[in-house]
Amino acid sequence: MQINTKNFGIIEYNPDDVIYFEEGIPGFEDLHNFLIITDNREDMPFKWLQAIDNTDIAFVVIDPRVFKPNYTFEIDEELIQALQIEDINHLLIYVIVVIPDEIEKMTANLKAPIIINAKNNKGKQAILDNDEYLIKHPILEELKNAYSNA
């Protein structure tokens, strides 16, 4: 199958790769089907969560453990049921990144990670009840440090 996206042009994809968000994503509740688009360069930590239902919508995402290795949170029973989680090793964790014109002000939403069960391709954006994580967590310096230590 293929879609014609605003940011990437025509993309070929396998229907088995579609990630289904039953409730959509907060603010985009009418969008349920997404793809993870990866830049194949090793030095590129960012990916894109591309909506299939509205191909003008794509979110920049990153695994938060790239820049914050100790990023952890509790997985509650509601999330286990919603994503049919049997093994946490099958979970993919991403956070949405905002990259403004002034790149040094780049932030990630650590308060609301996107959790995907890779076993069944079900996804959900969880809202954490945790004051430690910010909605607008600055990440540029942490990314620089992560890559300088690699």
UniProtKB/Swiss-Prot annotation:
Keyword match Cytoplasm: yes
Q: According to its UniProt record, where is this protein located?
A: Cytoplasm
Mind listing the UniProt keywords for this protein, alphabetically?
Bacterial flagellum biogenesis, Chaperone, Cytoplasm, Translation regulation
Subunit note: Interacts with translational regulator CsrA and flagellin(s).
What NCBIfam families does this protein's entry cite?
Answer: PRK13285.1-1 (NF009793)
Cytoplasm as UniProt keyword: yes
**Function, as annotated:** Acts as an anti-CsrA protein, binds CsrA and prevents it from repressing translation of its target genes, one of which is flagellin. Binds to flagellin and participates in the assembly of the flagellum.
SUPFAM superfamilies reported for this sequence: BH3618-like (SSF141457)
Q: Which GO terms describe its cellular component?
A: cytoplasm
Chief place of localization = cytoplasm
Q: Name one GO biological process term.
A: regulation of translation
The record ties this protein, via PANTHER family, to: FLAGELLAR ASSEMBLY FACTOR FLIW
The protein's name in its UniProt record: Flagellar assembly factor FliW
The entry assigns this protein to a family as follows:
Belongs to the FliW family.
